[in-house]
Amino acid sequence: MKKIPTFDDVITFANETHMNINVELKGVSGPDGTRLSESMVQQVAEKLASLENGIDVMISSFNIPLLKLAETYMPQYRRAVIFKAVAFKADWRTILDFCGSKIVNIEDAKLTQNRVEMIRNAGFDLNVWTVNKKERANQLANWGATGIFTDKADAMIHLERD
């Protein structure tokens, strides 16, 4: 039985393989949520400081306050706002501007070519989750999506860019 890797394990793996990483910050709730959220973001920043140069890091979250904390504690890393398809509304640019982000990570459900082109033409990167069909991945790439999240990376290797 394999163990679930710790964040330290992920940092070690990234350093050994020179693999870029996406760190998704999850919300903290409860009566002490604000303090715990700040502590979590500080700890993530401390761990990421041990990454070797040249490893690209993206910090992403559905949680806007966490992305603002990431901007404070980790301004050197790119930040992405994660959207469910139904939550992507007309105020999306305001949200990204508030977070200091130039990246939209959006759910694949009902994503259209018009929406992809609108986001890309506005100067934002666009990553789509979760794309497991090769045909759909090709279509999104042809429409201009910057990247995809997939459970089937071995089937998507043809999309790798230099």
Residue ranges and their predicted role:
Residues 1-81, 99-100, 106, 122:
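Metal-dependent phosphodiesterase/phospholipase catalytic core, i.e.
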Residues 80-162:
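C-terminal active-site rim and adjoining tail of enzyme catalytic domains
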